[in-house]
């Protein structure tokens, strides 16, 4: 495996290097082509865009438009700004000649962007309304004639304070006049320079770079996932089987019918264990190495083939946990089906709750709390550790076996489909028409989720605490009563200790402890499935209440 990992890593690094060289070659090609065509780039790759009906200027950087509206300089400037520009500013003799031709073809004079400025520090000077235009070129306009009532020449400083510039076709190329005078005007805006081939180069660069980055990221991600999965597989091999979600017990095998008859003494009544005979019965037996097992005999079925049966048992046998009854093997013989699982010494929970075995003693509070906690751990394993999740679907007192230390072991995991439908109906539709352990969404809408198991556990938890069955006869007047119909009035009256099983006479818990357990019961049995807690949360809550069992 290590050699394969090194080989894969070398191949991946080689692929990344090749892609990087390909990217550099592509970029060099683009760079060389750009360098060789640098001379013709401006001519062939750039286009100048102007607004409709505007004309490009001599320097290819501005667009100009003539407007014949006769108005003042201020209003002309405001109008030009609506286009995102200003009155025309002149930075060269070419621009002056261009604006003169644009204006003189229509009228005698037009406003442009020049205006007088008079300050106490710098004195009188000319400036342009467009701040991006260079300062006034004195060599171009050494002396601007002023045509106002101030007379020709520069006039007084007070007269020159509100003078604006216009172009003309007369002897003077430009002249100054009162800004409130009315003239046509010429506006200028920056041209929009577009690159024809730049977009193509950018697209090529983006595609090549994106491909390189995506491929590199995908390879790195694959390497990380592969390395992580490899570590996970190694850890599963050395981890504790109790924490694994798919550990196959080494003793799992397919038995012959002769082997089963031999180990159960031909399924004698002496070897028959207490249980539900309607499903075929359960018998005790022993393997050749002396290990005790239980053999569950299922009723004949013509709907399931041998291959399907073995497949289901194999899948169920992988679900190994200390609080789940382990499957040791199975047998299929001419339609007869048998399941062999580990023997749990103390038998089913319902016997200890309702019919204490001869020579046994009633369950005290600590025992019951330990049973509930270990059972919750087994269910939480099915919901949270197994992928995909396993829904038990048939959590009830007779499906919980107790070991010698009164730890719970959940039986029938993954085997609910082997129980005939009519038997399921008899189990779930209990006396009085109630549905016992089944969640309402499963009964009425056939919706089965892990939350259905949480509901069933809540019913069973109340049964463990109270010693009452999910449905039980009261008297001739009341008839049958569900466990919640009995418990709810006591809960509402805060009579917590009256909920306890009357056989609990020693080691009674405090009322607040019983209240916490009953609150957990009602939390698990809420009508809305999404409001029920996860089994891992239930385990945590119960572990906070568990007290060490008394050693007697």
Swiss-Prot record:
Residues 28-201 are extracellular. Its main location: membrane. It is a single-pass type I membrane protein. It comes from the Eukaryota. Residues 59-188 form the C-type lectin domain. Residues 1-27 form the signal peptide. This is C-type lectin receptor-like tyrosine-protein kinase At1g52310.
């Amino acid at each position: 495996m290590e050699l394969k990992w090194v080989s894969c890593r070398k191949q991946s690094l080689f692929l990344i290097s090749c892609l990087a060289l390909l990217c550099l070659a592509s970029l060099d090609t683009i760079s060389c082509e750009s360098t060789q065509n640098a001379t013709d780039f401006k001519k062939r790759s750039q286009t100048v865009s102007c607004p409709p009906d505007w004309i490009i200027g001599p320097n290819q950087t501005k667009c100009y438009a003539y407007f014949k509206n006769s108005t003042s300089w201020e209003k002309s400037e405001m109008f030009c700004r609506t286009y995102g520009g200003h009155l025309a500013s002149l930075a060269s003799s070419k621009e002056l000649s261009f604006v003169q031709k644009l204006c003189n073809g229509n009228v005698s004079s037009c406003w442009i962007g020049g205006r007088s400025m008079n300050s106490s520090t710098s004195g009188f000077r000319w400036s342009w309304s467009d701040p991006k235009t260079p300062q006034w070129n004195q060599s171009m306009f050494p002396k601007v004639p002023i045509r106002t009532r101030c007379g020709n020449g520069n006039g007084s400083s007070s007269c020159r304070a509100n003078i604006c510039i216009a172009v003309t076709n007369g002897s003077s190329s430009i002249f100054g006049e009162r800004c409130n005078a009315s003239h046509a005007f010429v506006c200028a805006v920056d041209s929009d320079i577009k690159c024809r081939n730049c977009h193509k180069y950018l697209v090529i660069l983006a595609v090549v770079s994106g491909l390189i980055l995506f491929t590199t990221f995908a390879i790195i991600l694959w390497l990380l996932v592969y390395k992580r999965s490899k570590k996970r597989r190694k850890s599963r091999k050395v981890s504790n089987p109790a924490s694994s979600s798919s550990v196959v017990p080494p003793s799992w095998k397919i038995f012959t019918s002769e082997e089963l008859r031999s180990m159960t003494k031909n399924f004698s009544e002496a070897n028959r264990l207490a249980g539900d005979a309607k499903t075929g019965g359960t018998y005790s037996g022993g393997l050749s190495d002396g290990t005790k097992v239980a053999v569950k005999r299922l009723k004949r079925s013509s709907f399931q083939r041998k291959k399907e049966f073995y497949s289901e048992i194999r899948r169920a046998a992988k679900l190994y946990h200390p609080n789940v009854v382990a499957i040791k093997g199975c047998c299929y013989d001419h339609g007869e089906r048998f399941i062999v699982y580990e023997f749990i010494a103390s038998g089913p929970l319902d016997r200890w709750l309702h019919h204490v075995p001869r020579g046994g003693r009633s369950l005290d509070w600590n025992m019951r709390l330990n049973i509930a906690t270990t059972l919750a751990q087994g269910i939480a394993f099915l919901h949270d550790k197994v992928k995909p999740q396993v829904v038990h679907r048939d959590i009830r007192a007779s499906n919980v076996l107790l070991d010698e230390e009164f730890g719970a072991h959940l039986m029938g995991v993954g085997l609910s489909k082997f129980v005939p439908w009519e038997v399921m109906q008899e189990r779930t539709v209990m006396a009085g028409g109630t549905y016992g352990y089944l969640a309402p969404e499963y009964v009425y809408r056939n919706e089965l989720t892990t939350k259905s198991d949480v509901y069933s556990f809540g019913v069973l938890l109340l049964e463990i605490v109270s010693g009452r069955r999910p449905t039980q006869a009261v008297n001739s007047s009341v008839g049958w009563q569900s466990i919640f119909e009995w418990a709810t009035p006591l809960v509402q009256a805060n009579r917590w200790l009256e909920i306890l099983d009357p056989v609990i006479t020693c080691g009674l818990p405090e009322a607040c402890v019983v209240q916490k357990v009953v609150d957990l019961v009602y939390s698990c049995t809420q009508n809305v499935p999404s409001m029920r807690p996860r089994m891992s949360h239930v385990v945590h809550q119960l572990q906070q209440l568990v007290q060490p069992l008394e050693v007697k």
